Amino acid sequence: MIFKQLFDQKSSTYTYLIASSKGREALIIDPVIENVSDYIILLKELDLRLVKVIDTHIHADHVTGASKLKDITKCSTIMGDHTPADAVEIKVKDDEYINLENLKIKAMYTPGHTSDSYSFLMDNYLFSGDTLLINGTGRTDFQNGDSKDAYNSIFNKLLKLPDETFLYPAHDYKGEKVSTIGKEKKQNPRLQVSSVDEYVELMNNLKLKKPTEIDFNVAKNINLGA
C-alpha cells in the first residue's frame, strides 16, 4: 500500500494520499487548494491515477482543493450525506464503504465539531477529521457544532475501536503526526472526563478565537473550493 501524509504549514492541515500500489488508483483525503500542484506532482511521481477525493467536513480554516483536483484529474468528490455542499458528487452514509480497488474505507458519521463531520476507517487507520485530535478534540462552537454530539461520536464510536487503531487527524499544531486510540484514551486531556455533562462544560469554557477567514473559507468550501 502507498500511504502519504502531507502537511500544510499555513493551516496546520494534514492531507492523506492512499493507493494500493504504484501505477494504480489513488484517493486523497482533505486536500488544501494551495497545495494541489504538489499533489499532482506526487501523483505523477508515483504513477497514480486520482479517482476519488474526500473532505471529512466543511472546513473553516482552509479552502479545499477538491474542485480543483476534479477539474484537473476528473476524479469523483465525496463527502458524508449530512454535508451542505450540494456540488459534491457522492454522498456516503454512516457505515457505508468506499472502494479503492482492493482497499475498503468505511464512512463513520461523527458529528460534534460540525454537524456534517465524518471520520473514515481503513483497516486499522482512522482518519478522524477534526473530531478527534492528538491530545485534543475539535472545537464545537461554530458550524452547528454540538458538544454532546461530539462526546457521543468520540466516546461511543471512535473510542470503541481497537486500542491499536492508528489515529490520523486533519490537524495538528505541535508537530505530532500519528497516535493510537489506546494512547488517546490514556493521555488525551479532553478525554479524562467522567460524563457527557463534564465534557460539555469543558468545551463550553475553551474561549477560542474565531478562525480569521472562516466566513470566506466556509462559503468557498460549500462549493468544494470552486
Q: Which sequence ranges carry the predicted segments?
A:
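Core dinuclear metal-dependent hydrolase active-site scaffold
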Residues: 17, 97-122
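Active-site HxH/HxHxD metal-binding segment of metal-dependent hydrolases
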Residues: 12, 23, 31-107, 186-194, ...
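Residue-level marker for buried hydrophobic side chains located in beta-strands
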Residues: 27, 52-54, 127-128, 168
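Histidine-centered catalytic micro-motifs
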Residues: 53-63, 108-115, 167-174
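Accessory terminal helices/loops
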Residues: 152-166, 170-226
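Conserved beta-strand hairpin/beta-sheet module of binuclear metal-dependent hydrolase folds
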Residues: 1-46, 119-129, 135
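Active-site metal-binding loops of divalent metal-dependent hydrolases
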Residues: 31, 58, 82-83, 113-114, ...
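Divalent metal-coordination and catalytic microenvironments
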Residues: 18, 30, 57, 69, ...
